[in-house]
UniProtKB/Swiss-Prot annotation:
Alphabetized GO MF terms: structural constituent of ribosome
GO cellular component: ribonucleoprotein complex; ribosome
Single biological process term from Gene Ontology: translation
Organism of this sequence: Rickettsia akari (strain Hartford)
Top-level taxonomy: Bacteria, Pseudomonadati, Pseudomonadota, Alphaproteobacteria, Rickettsiales
Name of protein: Large ribosomal subunit protein bL27
Length: 86
């Protein structure tokens, strides 16, 4: 009698669904308060002006305006610039 179970594939075949992370609004795009700009694990992109940071590190808009991505001292930062009607 064999004491080792044959290496079949019956115990395989499970996988988790993707988490739908990433940038949701790109540079220059119009946002309203509450719009999600970035979904991420950890602060890969840091919050700047007029954006909030959720407990799961989601960055969202606090005001109406345009999204702006920039790099300062090797940190990616996202801001929302207010639209001025001139």
């Amino acid at each position: 009698m064999a004491t080792k179970k044959a290496g079949g594939s019956s115990r395989n075949g499970r996988d988790s669904a993707g988490r739908r992370l990433g940038v949701k609004k790109s540079d220059g795009q119009y946002v309203i308060p509450g719009n999600i700009i970035v979904r991420q694990r950890g602060t890969t992109i840091h919050p700047g002006t007029n954006v909030g940071l959720g407990k799961d590190h989601t960055i969202f808009a606090l005001i109406e305006g345009r999204v702006e991505f920039l790099t300062k001292r090797n940190h990616k930062i996202v801001n929302v610039k207010e639209i001025t009607n001139a």
